[in-house]
């Protein structure tokens, strides 16, 4: 088990889909991020673990253009996140705590609405493809309010990937899901990973997080305390190691 932050946080920046350098975010006297740096190559899946208040959601908000950092930089697919360029918006998909779905619309109506926002060609075909990928084709004409929490989360991923983004951000996607819904969501994310999407996910679910990723980060008090390849992680003893890292 690696016991400290890997010093080579950006070994191959010239080939990286995501390049983050010394991101800092202050809220008055509170430092939510204090110098986060890392690279992520195309098709890699990074899971970020950390307690509440570690700065995980703040990091996701900055990387998706929803919040400006106090200092530092972030590049995604060659686009500067700080400029919030429309082209960058087309490269990313975001699943946050809110599903961003309209409960009184059907699944198909929801995706057709977003397809029009993205000015997609063949919007109905794209919407039906996304619904099928979520395993919800038999419920596509049902109002989203009738869906279970797990089904709504799968629909949220269908919404976030409708425009075929190259990078996907997920903030605590397994929260509130039962075992069946968790497994269905894992299958959906597995397919996206196979499809070479670059994925960053925050989660408290250690089992799911380790099972799906290529790289692991532990974040606390605004810093990455660990950033390592899953191949170098002692999976059987990770929970104990995780607790030790947070207590240092």
Where are these regions (language model features)?
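Conserved ABC transporter NBD signature motif
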Residues: 72-80, 88
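Catalytic Walker B motif of ABC-type/P-loop ATPase nucleotide-binding domains
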Residues: 168-171
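Helix-to-loop junction immediately C-terminal to a conserved catalytic motif
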Residues: 64
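Conserved ABC ATPase "signature" region
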Residues: 112, 116-139
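H-loop/switch region of ABC-family ATPase nucleotide-binding domains
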Residues: 203-204
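The feature captures the beta-strand-to-loop junction immediately N-terminal to the Walker
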Residues: 49-51
């Amino acid at each position: 088990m690696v016991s400290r932050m890997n010093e080579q946080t950006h070994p191959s920046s010239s080939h990286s889909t995501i390049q983050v350098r010394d991101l800092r975010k202050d809220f008055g006297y509170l430092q939510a991020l204090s110098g986060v740096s890392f690279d992520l190559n195309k098709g890699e899946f990074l899971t970020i673990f950390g307690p509440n208040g570690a700065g995980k959601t703040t990091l996701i908000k900055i990387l998706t253009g929803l919040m400006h950092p106090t200092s530092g930089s972030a590049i995604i697919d060659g686009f500067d996140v700080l400029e919030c360029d429309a082209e960058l918006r087309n490269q990313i998909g975001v699943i946050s705590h809110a599903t961003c779905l309209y409960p009184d619309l059907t699944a198909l109506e929801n995706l057709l609405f977003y397809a029009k926002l993205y000015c997609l060609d063949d919007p109905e075909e794209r919407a039906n493809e996304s619904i099928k990928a979520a395993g919800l084709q038999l419920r596509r004409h049902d109002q989203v309010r009738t869906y279970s929490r797990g089904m709504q989360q799968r629909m949220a991923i269908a919404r976030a990937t409708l425009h075929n983004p190259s990078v996907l951000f997920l903030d605590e996607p397994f929260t509130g899901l039962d075992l069946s819904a968790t497994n269905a969501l894992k299958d959906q994310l597995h397919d996206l990973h196979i499809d070479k999407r670059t994925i960053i996910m925050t989660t408290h679910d250690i089992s799911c997080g380790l099972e799906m990723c290529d790289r692991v980060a532990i974040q606390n008090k605004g810093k990455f305390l660990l950033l390592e390849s899953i191949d170098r992680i002692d999976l059987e003893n990770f929970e104990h190691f995780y607790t030790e890292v947070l207590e240092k």
